[in-house]
């Protein structure tokens, strides 16, 4: 196929949704208060979290910078699956500690490692675009149940380039990669993300994995595995 870059979503694409929601999220929820009490987070991230809380009309409690209060707000953000930048930064740091001390090991779909190898063998490149922080993305592929797979990725993108349902985000990714958008194939499990990528002239493919939510009617190519996908 005439693509130069294969851009991967993580949750529901390379990694089972169940791992994210039943392992990673609960692990961070159990560590929030201890993390805030450790005073290891730079003040700028606390300020960003406080600013978000003040603007959050869905959160009824007053937000202060006490460890308990910050922890409660982060737990709330997880419960509503909010794609919050400060939350993702905090979770990434908590997960880093968990991976490094052996409490966490990431789960990948079995077809992912061999597909990454085929892409590399074809002299193409792989990259990641996820709502999780770049640090968290790297951890998932470094501490996977198939070993360290970070050698296969040339770039990582998070919501620093914009939201995943905004076409401008994909245009920024193409610009940063220095690749024409039509030479990039984006894999995701969410129709609206694929729509946004296609509007930026990316090529797209939707993954229909076990545990993924059914998607509205769409015209994107779809696959259930990378096993027979030739780069």
UniProtKB/Swiss-Prot annotation:
Cofactor(s) this protein requires: Mg(2+)
EC number(s) recorded for this UniProt protein: 3.1.3.77
Protein transport is among the record's keywords: no
GO BP annotation list: L-methionine salvage from methylthioadenosine
Keywords recorded for this protein, A-Z: Amino-acid biosynthesis, Hydrolase, Magnesium, Metal-binding, Methionine biosynthesis
Annotated transmembrane regions: none
Chain positions covered by the region annotation Disordered: 206-231
Co-factor remark: Binds 1 Mg(2+) ion per subunit.
GO molecular function: 2,3-diketo-5-methylthiopentyl-1-phosphate enolase activity; 2-hydroxy-3-keto-5-methylthiopentenyl-1-phosphate phosphatase activity; acireductone synthase activity; magnesium ion binding
Pathway: Amino-acid biosynthesis; L-methionine biosynthesis via salvage pathway; L-methionine from S-methyl-5-thio-alpha-D-ribose 1-phosphate: step 3/6; Amino-acid biosynthesis; L-methionine biosynthesis via salvage pathway; L-methionine from S-methyl-5-thio-alpha-D-ribose 1-phosphate: step 4/6
Record's catalysed reaction(s): 5-methylsulfanyl-2,3-dioxopentyl phosphate + H2O = 1,2-dihydroxy-5-(methylsulfanyl)pent-1-en-3-one + phosphate
Protein family according to the UniProt entry: Belongs to the HAD-like hydrolase superfamily. MasA/MtnC family.
Subunit structure: Monomer.
General function of this protein: Bifunctional enzyme that catalyzes the enolization of 2,3-diketo-5-methylthiopentyl-1-phosphate (DK-MTP-1-P) into the intermediate 2-hydroxy-3-keto-5-methylthiopentenyl-1-phosphate (HK-MTPenyl-1-P), which is then dephosphorylated to form the acireductone 1,2-dihydroxy-3-keto-5-methylthiopentene (DHK-MTPene).
Entry-linked HAMAP family: Salvage_MtnC
Name of the molecule in the record: Enolase-phosphatase E1
Record gene name: mtnC
């Amino acid at each position: 196929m005439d693509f130069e870059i294969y851009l991967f979503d993580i949750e529901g694409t390379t990694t089972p949704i169940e791992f994210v929601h039943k392992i990673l999220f609960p692990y961070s929820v159990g560590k929030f208060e201890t993390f805030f009490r450790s005073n290891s987070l730079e003040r700028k991230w606390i300020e960003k979290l406080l600013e978000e809380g003040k603007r959050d009309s869905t959160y009824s409690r007053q937000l202060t910078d006490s460890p308990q209060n910050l922890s409660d707000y982060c737990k709330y953000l997880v419960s509503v699956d909010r794609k919050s930048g400060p939350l993702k930064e905090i979770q990434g740091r908590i997960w880093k500690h968990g991976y490094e001390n052996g409490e966490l090991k990431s789960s990948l779909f079995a077809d992912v490692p061999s597909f990454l190898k085929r892409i590399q063998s074809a002299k193409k490149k792989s990259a990641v675009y996820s709502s999780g922080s770049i640090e968290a993305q790297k951890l998932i592929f470094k501490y996977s149940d198939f070993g360290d797979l970070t050698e296969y990725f040339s770039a990582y993108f998070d919501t620093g380039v914009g939201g995943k349902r905004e076409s401008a985000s994909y245009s920024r990714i193409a610009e940063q990669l220095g690749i024409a958008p039509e030479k990039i194939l984006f894999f995701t499990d969410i129709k609206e993300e694929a729509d946004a990528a296609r509007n930026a002239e990316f090529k797209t493919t939707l993954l229909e994995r076990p545990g993924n939510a059914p998607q509205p009617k769409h015209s994107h190519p779809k696959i259930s595995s990378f096993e027979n996908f030739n780069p």
